[in-house]
Amino acid sequence: MTIELLDSMGVVDTSNAYIRKAVAAPASDVLGRIANLETRLARSAAEIDAAQAVRYRVFVEEMKAQVAPEAGRRKRDIDSWDAICDHLLVLDTSIEGDAEEQIVGTYRLLRQDVAERTGGFYSASEFAIGELLSRHPGKRFMELGRSCVLPEYRTKRTVELLWQGNWAYALKHGIDAMFGCGSFPGVVPEEHALALSFLHHNVRVRDEWAVSARPELYRTMDLMPPEAINPKKALAALPPLIKGYMRLGAMVGDGAVVDQAFRTTDVLIVLPIGKISGRYLNYYGADAGRFSSPVS
């Protein structure tokens, strides 16, 4: 995924009234809990600001992504989509202090109806999303992005809560398909030849779900012939997030894109709701009720 290289005029001010209105939410909107962790949407501009700080710690301090000087000064990963997206959070409620100090993970969610009113999807800067959307005029799409979790919370529980939140949100808004960028570290696709080739030959989107990288950015994923691929080793070489998408039943677009600012090689994940594995629907609950029981 790409970090926008914004100047100070392009940095979103989370204190403005528009964002305050956009993220206003009641205190009863918790989507799931596991022990001391809970997931819900951001309720205030201050919580969005705290989520941007978590993203900065992961994307810039850990992954060495490049950001604009103003974003670096503020130590926030910020772009223009923050003002229009919903921000899914995972909080550790055992941490003393305000909610802003408890945020340990975040996801950014952008519904199609919102994107069409406000300038489009983030992923469209790398992939030909418009072609996919035009093929499904009656379906509702949602983009997932800016997923990150602090290192000490990269556990099964945290990932489960993020997916619980995504699933509950998708059900609430009648979403038919989700998509978003998945990233490999580094800007040399050939270094990930095994994993990229495995995705290309085994889970590439086809027919009505076909979508590809923008022609001017397209990098082939077909780097090894099928007979040369060891599936077990290929699966082990996949980044955890992409592997998680595959387990759910996701497909991958045709072609990768090198993101120089983020220092990653990106692929497009496409997950139609109707293709989600029955195993995971049973696990999370068809009504997203798996982890939604109130605290006793």
Curated annotation (Swiss-Prot):
<comment type="pathway">
    <text>Lipid metabolism.</text>
</comment>
<dbReference type="Pfam" id="PF13444">
    <property type="entry name" value="Acetyltransf_5"/>
</dbReference>
<keyword id="KW-0012">Acyltransferase</keyword>
<dbReference type="GO" id="GO:0006629">
    <property type="term" value="P:lipid metabolic process"/>
</dbReference>
<dbReference type="GO" id="GO:0043810">
    <property type="term" value="F:ornithine-acyl [acyl carrier protein] N-acyltransferase activity"/>
</dbReference>
<dbReference type="InterPro" id="IPR052351">
    <property type="entry name" value="Ornithine_N-alpha-AT"/>
</dbReference>
<protein>
    <recommendedName>
        <fullName>L-ornithine N(alpha)-acyltransferase</fullName>
        <ecNumber>2.3.2.30</ecNumber>
    </recommendedName>
</protein>
<keyword id="KW-0808">Transferase</keyword>
<keyword id="KW-0444">Lipid biosynthesis</keyword>
<comment type="similarity">
    <text>Belongs to the acetyltransferase family. OlsB subfamily.</text>
</comment>
<keyword id="KW-0443">Lipid metabolism</keyword>
<dbReference type="InterPro" id="IPR016181">
    <property type="entry name" value="Acyl_CoA_acyltransferase"/>
</dbReference>
<comment type="function">
    <text>Catalyzes the first step in the biosynthesis of ornithine lipids, which are phosphorus-free membrane lipids. Catalyzes the 3-hydroxyacyl-acyl carrier protein-dependent acylation of ornithine to form lyso-ornithine lipid (LOL).</text>
</comment>
